[in-house]
Amino acid sequence: ALPIFIGFSNMLSYDFKIKPLREASSSNIMPAVVNYRVKDGERTGSLKTNPREAATIVALMKACMEQKEYAGKTFGVISLLGDNQVKEIQQRIDKEIDSKDIVARNILCGNSANFQGDERDVIFLSMVDSNEKSGPLPMMTYGVDDAYRKRYNVAASRARDQLWVVDSLDAASDLKPGDLRKRLIDYSMNPKAFSNEHRKIEKKSESPFEEAVAKNLFDCGYHIVQQWEVGAYRIDMVALYKNSAVAIEC
């Protein structure tokens, strides 16, 4: 896998210990990670479908297939929220893409479990969720037995050449810091920022524990200022979010 594709999984589950098997320059499709916001996307309640996201993903896939950079590339789509969205997308694929192309491109649409141990050159992730209310959605944590973290970990690491994160959310206002969905969206919008910020944290940290705390808070979406000066003293770090600040001594 390319470094950029294992970056999110490294951050989420492996404490940055996985080493990439391919060089970053070995893919001919750029950018390697794309965030695509469906501004009118809406989850249809208990059905756990987002028809506009489904339509957008199929339209993007068809557009890719027409470009020379994607000649011979295989495609996959992963729903991050249940099998009803899988059916919604699969129906559109069957309707809008020629069956010969479906076979030639080895198109697979499913959930994370369907892609365990499998890959495609180009992967589209459908987040499904939307927010029609004021204020952020309830926090999505790792789930019982780490189920959600495992789901996201697999989904974000199935692409060989390009990963699309297709969502209907404004990560800044619709999601809380630490929410799995926010972490994935933020990563997809600027994957290099995470590795760059981690290097800065490593330089400023005065102990391994302080480094681990600062990295975890940053990964969860907090703005971290290390070695905060207060008069003649220094605080290990201050975590900032909106109008709130918390001082942390390690």
Place the predicted regions along the sequence by residue.
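A short beta-strand element within the Helicase C-terminal
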Residues: 118-130, 137, 163-164
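Short glycine-/polar-rich loops that comprise or flank the Walker A/P-loop
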Residues: 31-33, 105, 119-122, 159-163
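Conserved helicase motor
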Residues: 80-82, 109-115
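Active-site beta-strand-loop-beta-strand hairpin of nuclease catalytic cores
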Residues: 238-247
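Active-site ExK catalytic segment of metal-dependent nucleases
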Residues: 126-128, 247-250
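Conserved helicase/translocase motor-coupling segment
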Residues: 16-91
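Helicase C-terminal subdomain and adjacent C-terminal extension
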Residues: 10, 23, 96, 134-231, ...
